Structures are given as structure tokens and as C-alpha cells.
Amino acid sequence: MKIKIINNDFPVAKIGLDRITTLVSAKVHNCIYRPRLSIADGTAPRVCLYRAPPGYGKTVALAFEWLRHRTTGRPAVWISLRASSYSEFDICAEIIEQLEAFELVTFSHVREGVSKPTLLRDLASSLWQSTSSNEIETLICLDNINQGLGLPLLHALMEFMLETPKSIRFAVAGNTIKGFSRLKLAGAMQEHTEKDLAFSADEAVALVEAEAVLGVSEVQIEALVQEMEGWPVLIGFLLKCELPAKSISTVVEIDNYFNDEIFEALPERYRVFLVNSSLLDVVTPDGYNYVFKCVNAASCIKYLSTNYMLLRHVEGEPAQFTLHPVLRDFLQGIAWAENPAKRSYLLKRAAFWHWRRGEYQYAIRIALRANDCRWAVGMSEGIILDLSFRQGEIDTLRHWLSELPVKDLHKNPIVLICFAWVLYFSQQSARAEKLLKDLITPPDKKNKWQEKGWPQLVFAIGKATNDEMLLSEELCNKWISLFGDSNAVGKGAALTCLAFIFASEYRFAELEKVLAQAQAVNKFAKQDFAFGWLYVAKLQQALASGKMSWARQLITQARTDSGAQIMETAFTSKMLDALELESNYELCRLDTSEEKFSEILEFIANHGVTDVFFSVCRVVSAWRLGRNDLNGSIEILEWAKAYAAEKNLPRLEVMSQIEIYQRLLFQGVTYINTLQAFEDRKIFSGPHSAPLKARLLLVQSLALSRDQNFHLAAHRALLAIQQARKISAGQLEVRGLLYLAGAQAGGGTLKKAQHNIAYALEMAKQLQCFQTVLDEIRLIKRLIPTSCEVFAAVNLDQAIGAFSLPQMVEIRKSAENKAGDFLTLKQVSVLKLVKEGCSNKQIATKMYVTEDAIKWHMRKIFTILNVKSRTQAIIEAERQGVI
């Protein structure tokens, strides 16, 4: 949706309306028009209510509606009810005055003894008697509806809305729902709440453009919108000042806004309630009453949620409420400033409340804030399952259990198992295995934790986190056969681990099968944490295949999937951020702030499994190289290599070293003998041999081309392409095709080079690994100067689609898309050119092949799609989502 700025030069029908037009126009100055908030025409409800806390643009939306109505020549009334002294008489008189200006009603020639209506119900009756008001659609805007008006006046307004002619419509802005129940019941009201009024990323970008804010990228804006949950006024403040690195609530403008517009506007008792509520993760009447030893929580919650919308319902939990996170930070600052001595005491009461109710996730988080870790020694099996396996509280448990004395830790095997699980996911496998050493014994039916095989399961999955995939797969399958029937939670975890292993090893057919099993078991066992890891496995498949738009789609699904609860814990949300880095880089939308990089690098240093660790480091290295920071590019890879050596992760070490060798080519160093010796390493004969060999062959090809050994370089590139195709690694295949083209151009076989460049570009366009193409072509042109001419002949922007995200076609992986599984990349490319109206001869020229080859491809396409003509082929391919 394109956002546009409304012109404020509006025609005015009557001179008496100049004042109102000026007033309303001022309200939209430097604001953006959001069409999605407009009042729908036709059969839509007659009343549109904009209801949200301060700063959500309610009045702005209302003003735009008034102006939109006036620009079409239709009458519009504007009433602001901010003054607490407003009476029904005042409102009635103001409406009449404005309607008379439009000659919709007239009371100047009524018979003697009859006065103008002073009550809204009488005005409604008068409007029915007016011919003009029944014919012309009129909009009445009521701004600042609030609980201070009192129920009698609110009810009178609602009755007026219901009893006026249908040609009169209403737009209302305020922060209360009081008095609107009849309108809701009658189906006469369309409501835009806080969620609707929040800025989308596109709208925030439009605001930046409207106010000519410089130095803020779209990715930064998107992150800001996500962090602010779209609160327009906060986003506006932050865009006008330097974006803070720490707490946003400490920004002076935001602090002042919260204090003046929200905090000081509340009665004292509700200010106290809000400050206290900021200490709780979720606010419930019983929980608040227990923690703060009072009895009035229910009435305060009702008042603040109904009249100010400052407390929001937790989705799916109507009895639970939360505060906006930035407002909560502001209120917590007040709480600790006013009463720092009570901090620990109140937090412990809150933690105990959740603990007593079995809400251990909340209890642990609050207990950590209170620096109280004593409860860990009393954890039962149920709690360990909930926290470790179902909830995935890795970060929280690591901090908590690390504080326990060793003697207390060893008193409870369940706590020990839990800690080992956490350590494995924190890349501390040696320490984890030391804890499990005495627990991995033959099952003892007297010990429930042994009977269900918890130590063996943690050990099996832990091996995968340490990149020992073969052993982990063997142990997981063995565990499922021994314990799977009696331990659903454990079985779900083991199947999820297998899914991750298969994704890492490019075993995509096996991955599809185990994903179906894992999803079914995890759903039955309520395994929220495992669902997050299943998304990670799918993401690994998408990234390994090079399908970046599919990866992007999966990330969006993961973040919005309430069943997976990925955003509920820091561990899984940061894992998603780390995986997102590669897709954002390829789609040319990377957040390049060092702060963002630092956060992700810190996370992978503590929790990064090999595939995630390498993905992040490779992207950061490539980005730095693109900025001509060769030393910085190598530095991050050297860090990854040193980390791998420290943690005994040979695959990570080898992949990092291969990338380092590629960077060293810029300095004229080839290490060709060392590269050949790499193939003798044990890791090259394991399950990851194909992608490792492909990466090594690519660097060898580049090194040979640099030494002008073009024949052997082309041979190495072909071998890399074969390895990539064997495992469906599209991104590696694109690189191989470009390296092959570079070697062919260097050797003088230009036509073959052109053919492979065209093929690589078409493949990259479909996969949407755009940055790979840009990076590799820049590298090839620098190392093989004779290839510059053939690459210069390619219009990259046109070939790849100008890298414009809105123009990108999503590559969706759906059950219906059967043909996409059988049509080759070349055949899909042929179909796209057919759709553009190209003849077989034109297609052959563009793809650097013979016309007979195109005819052969068309026959295959007809067979696979079961069609008889080119037109039918296009229709069927579009229906199945192939093109």
C-alpha cells in the first residue's frame, strides 16, 4: 500500500467554517494519511470508533476523515469534547450551528414559541424532518470521548447516533468504551483499537519520508516498529532524535510524554496501581491482591482497561493483563526510585505467587530479578519438563542454576539433568557430560527419571549441539526404541533433534518424513520449545537450498505462530534473529548496525550450534568485505576458527578456514597445496562431505583461475556444481556457475561463459539469493580481469529484477505445487519467457542454447503439466504457483 501525504489546501463551502477547517487542518500537519483507517462507504456500520491510549493518532485519523469528507463537497461537523464542562446543551448547540452553516437545517424561521432543540434526542427528531439532511451524507466527528463526560451524557450521545437519519454518519475518537454497548449490540459500530492504530513498518517509512529524516534505514525502522509495538508517538519521537542504544523509556521526550500525558492525568490511586503493576509479568486481580496485600485490584484493572486502555488483555487469557513494554519500563523506574528497599520483598512475593500456581516460567524470571535461587533445589520432574523441554528457558535456567552451590546441585538428579541440558545448549558439552556421567546407567524402575530415560535423552541430543551428528542420530533412534512409547515429551524432543540433523546434512527427503512425525508428537506433548526447533530445521533447509524468500516466509510464520511460542523466550527469539541474518543479507535488507551484529554475535558465542554460528560469521564477513574492510572480514572468520578449536567443532573450523583462504586470494595468496591437503581430513568423509567438498572446490577453482590455470579451474567448478546439485544446494550451485563462467571467460570460451552467467542469474532470481551474485561477480572480476568484459555485458539490475523487494515473487512450498518438484530450473525459466511472449528462437538466444533444446524443454513441460499448448502451460503453471 502506497502511503501519501494529504494536501491541506481544502475548499470551504461557508466562511463560518474557516475556523474549524484551520483547526482540523492543523491536526494533520506533518502527519501521514493511512487509508486503511478510513471509514468504509456503503453498507459499513454508521459509527466508526477510534479507541486507544494517548499517542496512537486517533485525532489525526478523525481529522483526515473530516477533511476527506469535505474535499468531496459533503458536509462535515467537528466537535471536540476535551473540556470537562461540556454539557448536552453545548454539544447540541454546536452541532446545530455547524449544520446551519451548510443549510442542512434551519431554525431561524420556525413558528413563534418554538425554540431550537437543546437535547440531542430532539435534534435527532428535527433532522428526520429536514429533507436536505436525509439526502446528503453528512459526517459528524466527535473527538476526545472520555469517561469524564459521565454516563448520562455518553448514553445521550449513543442514543443520538442510533436515532438520526441513515445519511448521517459518525466518527468518534477517545480512550473509553463506556456507553458504547448499545452500538456494539446493534452492529452499528466499526472499532479501530490500539492494535489497528499502531504503525506498520510501511507507515513508519512513510513518516520518515514525509519528515525528511536522514540516516535511518528501512531495516532500522522495521526493528523500531517491532520494539515499540507500533506506538506512533514513540516512533515519532525516536525518529527525530538519535536512536538510543539502551532503555528507550529514558529518552527525555518519551519520559516527559509518559509523565505529562498519561501518568499525571490519572487519579492518585490508579497511578499507584500502575506503578505496582509494572513489577508483574502479567497482572491479574488475585495475583496483584496477593503481592501487594490489598483487595481493590479488580476495580482498578476494569477502570484502566475500560477508560484508558493502559492495561491490555493477554491473547487467549481474558483474565490476564499486561502493560506496553516501554510504558512498563517507565513505571518500573518510578517504582524503584520511590521504594528501592521493597524491591526484593515484592519480587519474591510475585515469584511465589506464580510458583504456587505452577507457573514456573514466570516464577523463575521474577526470582532471578530478585536474586533468589533457593527454590531450584526443590524442582520436581514436572517442573523440569515444563521449564527445560516444553518452555525452553535456556538463558533463564543457565543463570539460575549457575548460582546454586555444587552440593545442592548434586542432591537432586532432576536438577542435574536440567542443568546438563542447559549446558549442552550453551556450548559447554564437556561440563554437561561430566554432570551426566554418573546418571547414564541402566534404567532403574525405582527412579522415575531413570525409567523414562532422561539422562540418555539429554546425552543424545547434546551430541547434536556439539556437532557430533552421526552419534547423535544413532543415540536418538536408540532412545526412541527404548523409551519413546512411555515418554511422549522425550520422543518429541528426539524426533525434533533428528529433524535438525537431517536439515544440517542436506537430507531433505528424510527431513520431510521426520517433520511430520515430530509435529504430531510435539502437539500431543505440548512441546512449545520443540516447535521452535522444528522451524529452525525448516529454516536450515531453506537457507541450505538457497531459497531466501521461503526462508523469509518461514521466519514470519515462526514469529506469529502462537503454538511455537518462539518470541516467548530470549533463546528461541535470538536464534531466529541469527538465522534471519543470512536471508536479510541475500535480499539486500540487512540491518548493518554494529549494535545488531554485536547482539547476534554474543548470542552465537554462548549458544550457537555449528550451522548457525557459521551462517552468522560468513554473513558478517561478507558484509565487511563489501565495505572494503578485508581485515575485518578475515578477523570475524579467524574468531570463528578459534572458537571451533576451543569447542572441538572440526566442521566449523574447516568451513571458517575455507572462507579465510578465499579472502586471502585478494592478497595474492593461493595456498593451493594446503587446499588440496584439506580433502584428506576425516570430516570430508562424513555426512557433511558434499557441502564441504563443494565449498572447497569453489575456492580451489577461484585460486586456479587467479593463477590462470583456467582449464583445471573450470573442471573444479564443474565438480562443485555436481556436489551442490547432489544435495540441492542452490546457493552453492549459483556460485559454481559463476566461477565456471569466470574460468571459461578467462580461457576465451565466451559463449559458454555467457550461457552459464545467464543460467546463474536466472537461478539466483528464482532463489532470491541476490547478494551472492553481487559479491561473487565483484570477486571474479577482481581476480580474473579478462572476465570483466563478459560480466559487464550483463545488466544485473534488469537481470535480477533491480533487487526491489515489492517486485519479488515468493517461492512458496505448498502441497499443491506438484509441478515445481519436477520441472527443472531451466524449464521454469523457459516458461517465464513464454509468458513474456517470446518465441522459441528468442528464448534460445536469451538462454544461449539452440532452438531445438528449447523445443525439447517445451515438450517436457507439456508432459509434466499435462497440457497441449503454450497458453495452457502458462495458465497451469500460474495455478500451481510455479511461475
From Swiss-Prot:
Keywords noted in UniProt: DNA-binding, Transcription, Transcription regulation
Segments crossing the lipid bilayer: none
Pathway, per record: Hydrocarbon metabolism; alkane degradation
Encoding gene, per UniProt annotation: alkS
GO biological process terms held by the UniProt record: alkane catabolic process; regulation of DNA-templated transcription
Signal peptide start-end: none
Stored InterPro entries: Sig_transdc_resp-reg_C-effctor, Tscrpt_reg_LuxR_C, WH-like_DNA-bd_sf
SMART domains the record matches: HTH_LUXR
Gene Ontology terms, MF aspect: DNA binding
General function of this protein: May act as a transcriptional regulator of AlkB.
Domain HTH luxR-type: 816-881
CDD domains: LuxR_C_like
Lineage: Bacteria, Pseudomonadati, Pseudomonadota, Gammaproteobacteria, Pseudomonadales
PROSITE patterns the record matches: HTH_LUXR_2 (PS50043)
DNA-binding region residue numbers: 840-859
SUPFAM superfamilies named in the record: C-terminal effector domain of the bipartite response regulators
Name listed for the protein in its UniProt record: HTH-type transcriptional regulator AlkS
Pfam families attached to this UniProt entry: GerE
Highest taxon of the lineage: Bacteria
